[in-house]
A protein has these predicted regions:
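Local cysteine-cluster metal-coordination motifs and their immediate loop/turn environment
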Residues: 44-59
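Minor-groove-contacting beta-hairpin "wing" of winged helix-turn-helix DNA-binding domains
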Residues: 393-397
Length: 414
């Protein structure tokens, strides 16, 4: 999963080149962090077989009739990571997420090289969760066995639906039969598998939504991600909106999903995430708890904490530009020191997605700001019935989860 990143309130400063200017980030600043948050690594593979009309991620259709420039891109990823090392020196990496795009376009040898480079350059935890996204249209049994042997230990499969008509409407390259076959292959080699599905699809009925979810539940995978389809700006669907279920039907779908997944033994622990006991996505939990993540690859975002500041980075988005810049020692297009006034909203934007919320102490631990900096907002949200009144936690109520945007906006400074 790509992290939720708020739109910056000001134009970013010119990016320092990699870790050459690490001294800039160690100078005194507006905040005081007691310790570094946990660190994750996000790796972006930008190519897809075809761009989906609803997708606003940094993904690019692979050149027709040609292979992706795998070797050159892996060279660039290693160069990018090497340039970033001074910013994270000595910090253990707890999770890795290889997203896209479609990372399963990488060959078995390419994935093995990528993971070998990561292990050679970073102190990866022995039990690190290493997730790879995969598209059912790119599944080959032998290749996925090799991915597992290389060290991938969690697979996230972009199913979206098992209904052929809905898959066609979404512009997916696979059908329902391919989706089922992909899950069968995955479960032969992986015991930690997430299925991505969407609901409130074009022309979808409640009965069809139920059928999709029941099919997913029948596989008893460790994790499900169930997303309400939204029309994102700068997508084909935004320009040519399809006919979607009305709000009442979408809410009925959501209520049924929550009840049915709970009945099946899945815990709804985050806005769109459902897990069997102790099988939550550790990488995504680090995002939602406002942990740190180094992002490498075309268009990848990163958040890194220092004693007196929080740094956000973004790599060059176009794959060709990214590869050129990374090999020249300057993969980072934008970098900025997050203003202390923005940190409360950034923290809450993520933490309030969690059903259990977070310990109140985590606000200071991960923003470097005292909790009383948001006392008025906490009081207002509590008075509105959107936050649990327990002062030891920051936890949304059932009403707060239902009206999450309203709850988050309370913490948005004008």
């Amino acid at each position: 999963m790509i992290p939720i990143v708020p739109v910056p309130g000001a134009a970013p400063a010119p990016a320092p080149s990699g870790g050459d200017n690490v001294g800039l980030w160690l100078k005194p600043g507006q905040i005081s962090l007691p310790a570094s948050p946990p660190l994750s690594l996000y790796v972006h593979v930008p190519w897809c077989v075809r761009k989906c009309p609803y997708c606003d991620f940094n993904s690019h259709a692979a050149p027709d009739g040609s292979e992706i420039p795998e070797a050159a891109y892996l060279d660039a990823l290693r160069a990018d990571l090497e340039q970033s090392l001074p910013l994270v020196w000595g910090r253990p990496v707890h999770t890795v997420f290889i997203g896209g795009g479609t990372p399963s376009l990488l060959s078995a040898a390419g994935m093995d090289r990528l993971l070998s480079d990561i292990r050679a350059l970073l102190p990866l935890d022995a039990d690190a969760e290493i997730t790879m996204e995969a598209n059912p249209g790119t599944f080959e049994a032998e290749r996925f066995a090799s991915y597992r042997a290389s060290g991938i230990n969690r697979l996230s499969i972009g199913i979206q639906s098992f209904n052929d008509e809905h898959l066609q409407a979404l512009g997916r390259i696979h059908g329902g039969a391919e989706a089922r076959a992909a899950i069968d292959i995955a479960l032969r080699h992986f015991d930690n598998v997430n299925l991505d599905l969407m609901y409130a699809l074009p022309q979808q009925t409640l009965a069809q939504c139920r059928q999709d979810v029941e099919t997913a539940l029948s596989y008893r995978t460790s994790h499900l991600s169930l997303y309400h389809l939204t029309l994102e700006p700068n997508t084909l669907f935004a320009r040519f909106p399809p006919a979607l279920p009305d709000d009442d039907t979408a809410y009925e779908m959501q209520d049924w999903i929550e009840a049915r997944t709970a009945e099946a033994g899945y815990r709804h622990y985050e806005t769109s995430a459902y897990a069997q006991p102790h099988r939550e996505a550790r990488h995504n939990l680090n995002y939602w708890r406002f942990g740190d993540y180094l992002g490498i690859g075309a268009g990848a975002h990163g958040k890194l904490s220092f004693p007196h500041r929080v740094l956000r980075q973004m790599r060059y988005k176009h794959p060709a530009t990214y590869m050129t810049q990374a090999m020249a020692g300057n993969a980072v297009q934008e970098a900025r020191d997050v203003d202390a006034a923005e940190l409360p909203f950034e923290f809450m934007l993520n933490a309030l997605r969690l059903t259990d919320g977070v310990p109140a102490s985590l606000f200071h631990d991960h923003t470097g700001l005292p909790l009383h900096a948001i006392r008025r907002e906490l009081a207002l949200a509590t008075d509105k019935g959107l936050l649990d009144p327990d002062p030891s936690v920051i936890r949304p109520t059932e009403l707060g989860r239902r009206f999450l945007n309203d709850l988050q906006e309370i913490f948005l400074k004008s």
